[in-house]
Amino acid sequence: MSAFGCSSMTFHGHTEQRAFGGCRNTGGALSRFAILAGCWLGLICTKSWGAEVTAAHPSAEHIEFFENKIRPVLTQHCYSCHSAEATKLKGGLRLDSRAGLLKGGDTGPAIVPGQPDASLLIQAVRYKDEDTAMPPKKPLPEALVADLEAWVRMGSPWPETEKTGSPARVETQGFDWAKFRSEHWAFRNVVTSEPPTVKNTSWVSHPIDQFVLARLQSAGLTPAPPAEKRVLIRRAYLDLTGLPPTPEAVTTFLADPSPDSFAKVVDALLASPQYGEHWGRHWLDVARYSDGLGGFLDSEELPEAWRYRDWVVGALNRDLPYDQFVRAQIAGDLLSNDRDLAIATGFFAVGPTYISDGGDPEATAQARAETLADRVDTFSRTFLGLTVACARCHDHKFDPITARDYYALAGIFDNSKVELTSIAPREVVNAFDAAQKAIKDHEKLIKATGTNTAAKSQEAPLKAELERLKKAVPAAYAKAHLLVDRGNKDMPVAIRGDLRKPGEPAPRRFLQIVAGENPPLFRDGSGRRQLADAVTDPANALTVRVIVNRVWQHHFGQALVRTPSNFGMLGEKPTHPELLDWLASTFMENGWSLKKLHRLILLSSTWQMSSQYRAESFAKDGENRLLWRMNPRKLEVESWRDSMLAVTGELDRALGGPPSDRILESSRRTLYGKVSRNGDRFLSDEFLRLFDFPAPRSTSEQRTASTVPRQHLFMMNSGFMAARAQALSARLQRESSDDQTRITRAYQLLYARPPVADETALGLAFLAETTTGTTASRWDSYAQALLSAHEFIQNQ
């Protein structure tokens, strides 16, 4: 297929794009370019959270949202008057079941699933009508109202425990721990299996291939042929660095006949600093990294958050073993006096810290509860693949996680606080503070001279000395947002999640399902250091399975466990459980090295398959769960923008530093754009969110890949795209002397291949047409079409 992916369609006119949104119909040869790569009009569709969800089959994602965001609100603010436990049921309304919400009370159904504006519950919490406003004493925080609106919009999913199929839940006696550990795959020990014997041994170049091929053969499927070398090198560059290869790199690879030619490419990419930037961004998604400004009750800017981002990039580039990578983010400030390790606690410190709305006890408790819920949720889903925050109000409805487990972990974070503090050497801080004190002392002396004539005579030399002191002040020392210990107390279980209602004590410790029936208690400070030890203990199978699954996901577009942050009962089972465990055990044997894991995967025949579509294979495995081909993937917004800057020759490859609010005007990688918690505070937010960047209000395990009209309008009409097209056109004019050579160069830069004859002829015909503006404007339009092509936006 050509770069435009649209050879069978004919259009009878075109739209020439201008730099700032103007359009004019010009007709002619550019008609085949106007829809720009991929037949935009045919691809336009929308993707939503899924208002189609039904009560009978809520997804794991929706249930997590309900348990983390909705049940705590209903429990704390509604159940005292509207549940089975209410002394007197008010308004005939029960809110402790979906059926109760749908039935409603005296005024009708409380919710209309999928329609928040038509739902009485939403109208009440919006506080627009004082006669129906709820809760009666004061409105809910805006963030909680937004959560309720989102929940109704997605169809009001509500988990029904009697339908869970949980094999070991006994309501009256707690959990059958042994049964869970023996029957649920995620809680079993990692077992290293021998790679299975397969028939087509010629395809196998790696143990990974044996596991994959065995599943394919059992289903009557065969693997796709190998990808062409040009496709392979472009895939490797995009997978490992988020940038395309240069034509020179492609030529060198094609000319290298040695059997390890591709291994050399992989090793070079893993050694490049761009590797850490690209994979650091993947990690920042799960770490819900932002530069602050989350809105109501979470409105603080985090001016030094970028230091955590840079720490992640640096740690990945130097291949810090993953167990140490995890330990540093949980307790880096406690592991050594190295302030660099302390920066790693930004994993928690740059998350939301809610403040009290008004300072009353209820608001203070709510803010504290929401902050702790974020810490526990982000920690457990990121490192363990478990939704521990679902046990905030009660024992987990599906997984072997008790409310005591939740508050044991919450107590650890309740004994830790966020500080913006120095990471500079003590002598640097002392010198700066001494200089500032000297300035203040001189300012006081000047002020003390008053109007006395004799004293006034001393003012001039004092002012001169003050100016000298100001010029001599050393640069402000570096600071970072850190998590530090502040106490050593256990928390009680909060009755129904309300911190004002303490229940039984919950000593700080690790999860019972992992640590055993009598887990050791954490008594060392907050307990974070002991928590870090427990999480990275090789006996804990969750941590290692979760990370190898995440790495696999980013290389194939789908994970072996398709719910990467939920390995519990509602999560999906692995498609290749033996392969998952083989990867996990090999990963640990290789010293928890992420770079070795990447290399392992990329050198397999499985990863090197083409993305060739075959109808017979699709009929048997339409979702490609068994991996009969490589999944073609749309580039994430960072890779797409960065790739444009790379091929136009504009990319600034400098590493690290403070973020830019105006990322569309910058030549730096998109990683260095400012990101707000709600995705609506900085200029860079709108662009990023348009192309599926997740709002970092909570951990994000996988991005959506939408195709919506506004994206195509941006490609056609934005000043950013026009500027990139002009830059590419200018580069081609500089580097080549005639149009045919320029067209060839453009295809090599963008797609890592030369154009086929039809593509060259099409380009030459358009460029030669004198009725469509100047030569320069035709080249700009042609370049914009190539940059917007399906082939450029996709990783094959």
What do these predicted ranges mean?
Residues 47-333, 396, 416-546, 550-561, ...:
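Aromatic- and Gly/Pro-enriched helix-to-coil junctions and flexible linker segments
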Residues 1-30:
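N-terminal secretory signal peptides that target proteins for export/translocation
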Residues 513, 518, 758-771:
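Helix-loop-helix junctions that connect adjacent transmembrane helices in secondary transporters/permeases
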Residues 106-112, 697-703, 767:
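Conserved phosphate-binding loops in nucleotide/dinucleotide-binding enzymes
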Residues 122-126, 207-216, 287, 315-317, ...:
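An acidic, gly/pro-interrupted, aromatic-rich
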Residues 65-79, 144-151, 375-391, 409, ...:
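Sequence/structural segment immediately N-terminal to covalent heme-attachment motifs in c-type
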Residues 32-47:
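Bacterial N-terminal signal peptides
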